[in-house]
């Protein structure tokens, strides 16, 4: 929520970022430690968002936004590309053996769903913000499906935690 005043160095928006959504929707929250760290933090946020197909919040504050410090432009060729790994063909067969695209099929490690560029012939599917059935992508209000999706979202965040280095705290 905007107060008309940027967040100061206390990062008072942390709890809002962590819990300020409807229902149980955990997601990764990152924060830059300095002005020079903003680039790396934004890059990491993008990597996580694409790899795990989950929203990521990156926190900043007035101190970082208005601060300045020397920053060496990185060698862009040394940065590992972020591959969206778009689906380009059907990923399963229906009960008759016909190849179909199931957007709810998940990577077993990241739990990321298959994602096709909207409008790709043969890979059409429903997208939007309403919760979908864990298996069919049809909109679902079923309580057991909702519980499964809540656990899936939490498992994604847990996988992100396991994928990043431990936080180094400086005294």
Regions from the language model: what does each represent?
Residues 1-24:
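Flexible glycine/proline-rich, aromatic-decorated loop/lid segments
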Residues 1-4, 29, 149-154:
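N-terminal start-of-chain detector that recognizes signal peptides
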Residues 1-2, 34-36, 62-65:
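Acidic, glycine-rich active-site loops and adjacent beta-strand->loop/helix elements
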Residues 8-11, 35-39, 147:
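Conserved structured core elements
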Residues 26-47:
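Active-site/ligand-binding-proximal alpha/beta "capping" segment
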Residues 41-171:
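Flexible, low-complexity linker and terminal segments
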């Amino acid at each position: 929520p905007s107060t008309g005043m940027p967040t100061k160095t206390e990062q008072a928006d942390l709890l809002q970022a962590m819990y300020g959504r409807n229902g149980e929707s955990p997601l990764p929250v990152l924060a830059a430690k300095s002005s020079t760290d903003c680039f790396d933090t934004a890059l990491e946020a993008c990597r996580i968002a694409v790899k795990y197909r989950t929203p990521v919040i990156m926190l900043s504050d007035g101190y970082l936004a208005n601060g300045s410090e020397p920053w060496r432009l990185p060698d862009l060729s040394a940065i590992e590309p972020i591959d969206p790994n778009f689906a380009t063909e059907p990923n399963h067969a229906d009960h008759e053996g016909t190849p179909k695209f199931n957007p709810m099929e998940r990577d077993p490690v990241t739990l990321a769903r298959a994602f096709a560029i909207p409008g790709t012939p043969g890979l059409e599917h429903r997208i939007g913000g309403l919760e979908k059935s864990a298996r069919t992508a049809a909109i679902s209000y079923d309580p057991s499906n909702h519980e499964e999706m809540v656990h899936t979202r939490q498992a994604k965040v847990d996988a992100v935690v396991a994928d990043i280095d431990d936080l180094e705290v400086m005294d």
